Amino acid sequence: MRLKYLKLKNFRGYRDGEITFSDLTAFVVKNDSGKSTILEALDVFFNDSKGVIKYDKEDMNITCGVDDVVISVGFDDLPNEIIIDATNKTTLADEYLLTKDGDLEIVKKFRNGSTTPKVYIYADHPQNPSCCDLLTKKSSDLKKIVKALNLEDVDLTRNAEMRQAIWNHYRDDLNLSESYVDISKEDAKKYWDKISNYLPIYSLFQADRKNSDNDSEVQD
């Protein structure tokens, strides 16, 4: 996957900002304009405060009047397929986990001063109450829905296939809309566990301190 953009809300000096990236990106601005904040926000996102930068509740922009800090990162050049359930292959598009532009946007929200984020995917996802939460359903729950809808020729051993069959049943009434899909809870957490394996490796080297081969970012 390739880093495409970063969105910051209520993080330090950024109330609501977006930065786009290309194969080579350089920031040329005067001092104290927020260059380091961008790089450090990426470190918090990719390394979960286990890298150089540790997220602190004081990173919240207190002038915004809200308690949530949001770091969102968008990616393109996505894997052709992913395996979520055992050996069951699927795609991010088939699971309605992409934006309208076809990007994967992962969102980490630090709520009410918490230093542990909740993880979401901002995607063009079904809003129909009958099929809006299939990603959180266990296999047994999906089977019940398939049987209740009298869907035929569906492999009941494959969660992805059952989800596709249910969504296809409601294909004319999915009510697609870009929304936050919570992948921090229940079975949806498996998506984050798998998707995180495809994320780029991000290492931040700070020029204003001594760097050595023993640093964790070098050893990793």
Residue ranges, per PLM feature:
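Electropositive, glycine-dotted interaction segments
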Residues: 88-220
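Intrinsically disordered, low-complexity acidic/polar segments
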Residues: 17, 28, 80-82, 115-117, ...
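Beta-strand secondary-structure signal
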Residues: 5-7, 18, 70-74, 105-107
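Beta-strand elements of well-folded, non-transmembrane domains
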Residues: 25, 75-79, 110-114
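Conserved P-loop NTP-binding catalytic core
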Residues: 40-102
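A general secondary-structure signal for short beta-strands and their flanking turns/coil
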Residues: 1, 14, 66-70, 99-105, ...
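Pre-Walker A-like glycine/lysine-rich segment at the N-terminus of P-loop NTPase domains
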Residues: 1-47, 56-66
